[in-house]
């Protein structure tokens, strides 16, 4: 049984002191894959300091960790640090589009929809993911660029988007036309 598994067992027993000892041991003895799984789980249950330590340790080799670190920093209200983590993901990385989307979310949180739109537009140039186009349409609707929003909503499969987001693109197109 790995130290990560022992830590999780200690958490189930609500023995936090023992869980902490196993956590410290896991950092030095468990495989990177085990640590990534542990970090993801710890993040999901709100053990952010421990998840952060693992992600920081593994981030140079696992760029997706920077996205998790940015989410933790954002949840802590440290948007500057969240942006710094996302800047670590370079344009050639498989995770670059995800970093752009995370940046767009952060800019939206900061009340900067124009900058958020720029990041989404950059992501849309790199992927044909429908949710990226949907995000662009939503921001264009918010910014009052109804003609552009209509074009973007029209590219999407209403059923698929509705299943993923609960939003009807048909309804959004209607709102845009009514606002022209």
Question: Which stretches of residues belong to each language-model region?
Answer:
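Start-of-helix register in tetratricopeptide repeats
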Residues: 1, 33, 64-67, 98, ...
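Register position in tetratricopeptide repeats
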Residues: 12, 44-45, 75-76, 109-110, ...
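Structural marker of alpha-solenoid helical repeat scaffolds
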Residues: 29, 58-61, 91-92, 125-126, ...
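Canonical tetratricopeptide repeat
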Residues: 37, 68-71, 102, 135, ...
């Amino acid at each position: 049984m790995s130290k990560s598994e022992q830590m999780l067992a200690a958490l189930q027993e609500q023995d936090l002191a023992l869980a902490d000892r196993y956590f410290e041991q896991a950092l030095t003895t468990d495989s990177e894959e085990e640590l990534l799984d542990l970090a993801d789980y710890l993040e999901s249950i709100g053990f952010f300091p421990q998840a952060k330590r693992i992600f920081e340790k593994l981030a140079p080799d696992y760029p997706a960790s920077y996205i998790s670190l940015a989410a933790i920093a954002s949840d802590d209200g440290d948007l500057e640090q969240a942006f710094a983590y996302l800047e670590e993901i370079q344009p050639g990385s498989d995770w670059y589009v995800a970093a752009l989307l995370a940046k767009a979310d952060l800019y939206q949180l900061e009340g900067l929809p124009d900058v958020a739109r720029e990041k989404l537009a950059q992501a849309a140039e790199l992927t044909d993911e429908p949710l990226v186009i949907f995000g662009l349409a939503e921001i264009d609707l918010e910014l009052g660029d109804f003609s552009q929003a209509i074009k973007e909503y029209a590219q999407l499969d209403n059923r698929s988007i509705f299943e993923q987001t609960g939003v009807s693109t048909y309804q959004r197109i209607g709102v845009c036309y009514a606002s022209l």
